[in-house]
From Swiss-Prot:
It comes from the Bacteria. Keywords: Cytoplasm, Elongation factor, GTP-binding, Hydrolase, Magnesium, Metal-binding, Nucleotide-binding, Protein biosynthesis. This is Elongation factor Tu. The gene is tuf. Its EC number is 3.6.5.3. SUPFAM superfamilies: EF-Tu/eEF-1alpha/eIF2-gamma C-terminal domain, P-loop containing nucleoside triphosphate hydrolases, Translation proteins. Its main location: cytoplasm. Monomer. Mg(2+) binds at T26. Residues 10-204 form the tr-type G domain. The lineage of its organism: Bacteria, Bacillati, Bacillota, Bacilli, Lactobacillales. It is found in: Cytoplasm. GTP binds at residues 19-26, 81-85, 136-139. Residues 136-139 are annotated as: G4.
Length: 395
């Protein structure tokens, strides 16, 4: 069967549901899908399909996630829901699903629970800056004051992690009742999605950001010069533009792109997502290597020392069998290459066990083009043992 073409008529936004286990994330996801589908007369994705999340591999890590899509009048959404807590942690840290915003689900019957806090912290660390709150299961709480108390607790918790707790929109309802078709609760879901439409801003398009391309390969074309190939990470590149070659060396080289090719055809302009070869003026083959990046001048710098939020794989996931300690020296895989680094654990953390999620400091042996929010994997002897996100640059 021929694949449907994706017609781009509305702005596209990636969102997800986060929150404690059994607070109703998947039920809410199914309810949103159903309510919006009925409004538009299309098929909904049902609970069982979402709950039975397929395994995906991202950076060598297996994650169960469900991606569903739906539309409001204003936007097209891709919605991600992960069944298990470990799946969420892995998802957010590896960037398997880059979320522009999220719906935080809190059961009014329980209030904020440990994973509620953990997901809020993760959202803060990996750059999910916009949250909308859905207080679920309010039909099971007789006392209105209790619901208000839970709302206050959630707002305080959000403020604690530098979210605007007082201003974040909070909606109250029952995802299950909405899924069963209760008209009053269907209205709440419609209201929730109107709020998501207006509160979670449209993401800056990748093409509007400064040009960046990690170098995957370098070769020479006789008589023409050196070509660096790779996938454009963000921004656009036009022939004749001045760029910088950044990373792995202390000094930055400037050069001009004299030609761009894609699939052996000449291209005037390359955009985010394109796999290209860029012909670089006056650059010797020995002066550029895999793992460096081509970038808009001044847009990215090299660093050696940074803090990161890291998920350490379990033995079952192919990770280490034993804990590691301060001064652990694995390889950190950034962009397209491994660089050795030394781990310094925070005060009070003696060791890190497989399966842990932890923040620590890393000092690399060579400078790499990095910035806040960059994803990387931790490797040892060619095997992935962890995945991380840069949270703070220290040098």
């Amino acid at each position: 069967m021929a694949k449907e073409t994706y017609v781009r008529t509305k702005p596209h936004v990636n969102i997800g549901t986060i929150g404690h286990v059994d607070h109703g994330k998947t039920t809410l996801t199914a309810a949103i899908s159903k309510v919006l589908a009925e409004k538009q007369g299309v098929d909904a994705t049902d609970f069982a399909e979402i709950d039975n999340a397929p395994e995906e591999k991202e950076r060598g890590i297996t994650i169960n996630t469900s991606h569903i899509e739906y539309e409001t009048e204003k936007r097209h959404y891709a919605h991600i829901d992960a069944p298990g807590h470990a799946d969420y942690v892995k998802n957010m840290i590896t960037g398997a699903a880059q979320m522009d915003g999220a719906i935080l689900v809190v059961a009014a019957t329980d209030g904020p629970m440990p994973q509620t806090r953990e997901h809020i912290l993760l959202a803060r660390q990996v750059g999910v800056d916009y949250l909308v709150v859905f207080l679920n299961k309010t039909d099971l709480v007789d006392d209105e004051e209790l619901v208000e108390l839970v709302e206050m607790e959630v707002r305080e918790l959000l403020s604690e992690y530098d979210f605007p707790g007082d201003d974040i929109p909070v909606l109250k309802g029952s995802a299950l009742k909405a899924l069963e078709g209760d008209p009053e609760q269907v209205k709440v879901i419609e209201e929730l999605m109107d709020t998501v439409d207006s509160y979670i801003p449209e993401p800056a398009r990748e093409t509007d950001k400064p040009f960046l391309m990690p170098v995957e390969d370098v070769f020479t074309i006789t008589g023409r010069g050196t070509v660096a190939s790779g996938r454009v990470d963000r921004g656009v590149l036009t022939t004749g533009t001045e760029i910088e070659i950044v990373g792995l060396k202390d000094e930055v080289q400037k050069t001009t792109v004299t030609g761009i090719e894609m699939f052996r055809k000449t291209l005037e302009e390359a955009q985010a997502g394109d796999n290209i070869g860029a012909l670089l003026r006056g650059v010797d083959r020995s002066n550029i290597e895999r793992g460096q990046v081509l970038a808009k001048p001044g847009s990215i710098k090299t660093h050696k020392k940074f803090k990161a939020e890291v998920y350490v794989l379990t033995k079952e996931e192919g990770g280490r069998h034993t804990p590691f300690f301060t001064n652990y020296r694995p390889q950190f895989y950034f962009h397209t290459t491994d660089v050795t680094g030394v781990v310094e654990l925070p005060a009070g953390v003696e060791m890190v066990m497989p399966g842990d999620q932890v923040t620590f400091e890393i000092e690399l042996i060579s400078p790499v083009a990095i910035e806040q929010g960059l994803k990387f994997t931790v490797r040892e002897g060619g095997h992935t043992v962890g995945a991380g996100t840069v949270t703070d640059i220290e040098d």
